[in-house]
Amino acid sequence: MSLPTDRKYTESHEWVQAEGDVFVVGITDNAQEQLGDLVFVGDVKVGATLKAGETAGVVESVKAASDIYAPVDGEIVAFNDELEANPSLINESAYTAWIFKIKPANAADLDKLLDAAGYQAVAG
């Protein structure tokens, strides 16, 4: 499994990349492979304030549905609207098709997440 090293990861298979004062969040290639062809990405509430680990949205495939979790405490500030019409963008390129952006309550929380090697150890 080849993972980008320019971002952090969660044990629940989200990737997180700092972009200015917000974090961009998506699901890992491993997660999209397990789910299969995605048919829906959504239920992300822009403006919602979440704690790390709380449900931020959902991804659904023909065979399963899975929650997407907030990687850090913060406020959801954007949803990738392109995914409403074309959720398969995640299947095509999991590391460029972001799902939501979160403004962290504490930017240092990024350092608490897994690096690529740590995620690889968890994900197998």
Swiss-Prot record:
Could you list this entry's UniProt keywords, alphabetically sorted.
Lipoyl
Q: Name one GO cellular component term.
A: cytosol
What does the entry give for GO biological process? glycine decarboxylation via glycine cleavage system
The cofactors required by this protein are: (R)-lipoate
**Classification via InterPro entries:** 2-oxoA_DH_lipoyl-BS, Biotin_lipoyl, GCV_H, GCV_H/Fam206, GCV_H_sub, Single_hybrid_motif
Cofactor remark: Binds 1 lipoyl cofactor covalently.
Lipoyl-binding domain spans which residues? 22-103
Q: Which residues form the signal peptide?
A: none
Domain of life (superkingdom): Bacteria
Residues annotated as carrying N6-lipoyllysine in the record are K63
What is said about its interaction partners and assembly?
The glycine cleavage system is composed of four proteins: P, T, L and H.
| HAMAP family, per the entry | GcvH
Q: What does this protein do?
A: The glycine cleavage system catalyzes the degradation of glycine. The H protein shuttles the methylamine group of glycine from the P protein to the T protein.
UniProt lists the family membership as follows: Belongs to the GcvH family.
Q: What is this protein called?
A: Glycine cleavage system H protein
Q: Which organism is it from?
A: Bordetella pertussis (strain Tohama I / ATCC BAA-589 / NCTC 13251)
List the taxonomic lineage.
Bacteria, Pseudomonadati, Pseudomonadota, Betaproteobacteria, Burkholderiales
